[in-house]
C-alpha cells in the first residue's frame, strides 16, 4: 500500500483555488483600486477618497505563508499620501496666495492713485479749457464792432447843419426895411445903372437876395411899418449896447444917406 505524503494531504481544491486567486486575481484588484484612488484624489482630494469603496484584502482567505503583505500597500496609504500632498499643496500655496494678495493690494493702490491723478488732470484740463474759452469770448467781444447808438434829435440836427453848411454857419446879412426900400428906389430910378450885381456889391449881400427883394410885390401897411420900425430899433439898441460893452462899436451905418450919396455922386459924375 503506497504511502501518503503529508504535504499532498494538505493540498485540496479549496486551498488551490485560494492560492490561485491570491496570486493572479487579487493583485489586479489591488492595482485597479490604487489607480482609481489616485485619480479620485487628484480630482476630489479628500472627499472623493472617502466615497470610493474597495475590496479589502484581509477578507480574502490567503495562507499565512503566501500573504503578500510586503508587496501591496493597504488602501489607507493612498488617503494618507493624498492628505500629505494636499497639506503640502496648501502650505506651499499659502505664501503664493499671500504674495498674490499683496500684489493685488499694491496694484489696487496704484490704480486708485492713477485714477485720482487722472481725475485731477481732467479737472485741471477742463478748467484750462473754460479759461481759454472765456478769454477768447472777451477778446472777441472787445474786438467786435459795437452797434451804433441811437442818436439824439439835437445830434441829427447838428449833422444836418454840417452837411448843409460845410464851411460853417454864416447867416446872411439882414437888411433893414429902410435899406430894402432904398434898393427898390435906386433900381426903379436907374435900372440900367443899379443892376443886381451892383446893388449886391454896394449893400454887401448876395445877388439872390437883391433879386428876391426886387421881385417881391408885397408892401406892408402903415401899422406893419410902425411895428417893424419899433422892432428894428430894439434890435439896434441891443446889438450896439453889446458891442459898446466889448469895445467893438463901429461907426453908425446910415443906409439912406449911403444910398443918396451913391445916387447923387454918380449923377454928378454923369453930368
UniProtKB/Swiss-Prot annotation:
Keywords: Mitochondrion, Transit peptide. Pfam families: Neugrin (PF06413). Residues 57-177 are annotated as: Disordered. Residues 100-117 have a biased composition (Polar residues). It is found in: Mitochondrion. GO terms for cellular component: mitochondrion; nucleus. The keyword Mitochondrion applies. Signal peptide: none annotated. Residues 118-130 have a biased composition (Basic and acidic residues). Its main location: mitochondrion. Residues 79-99 have a biased composition (Low complexity). Residues 1-59 form a transit peptide. Required for respiratory activity and maintenance and expression of the mitochondrial genome. Belongs to the RRG9 family. This is Required for respiratory growth protein 9, mitochondrial. It comes from Emericella nidulans (strain FGSC A4 / ATCC 38163 / CBS 112.46 / NRRL 194 / M139). The lineage of its organism: Eukaryota, Fungi, Dikarya, Ascomycota, Pezizomycotina. The gene is rrg9.
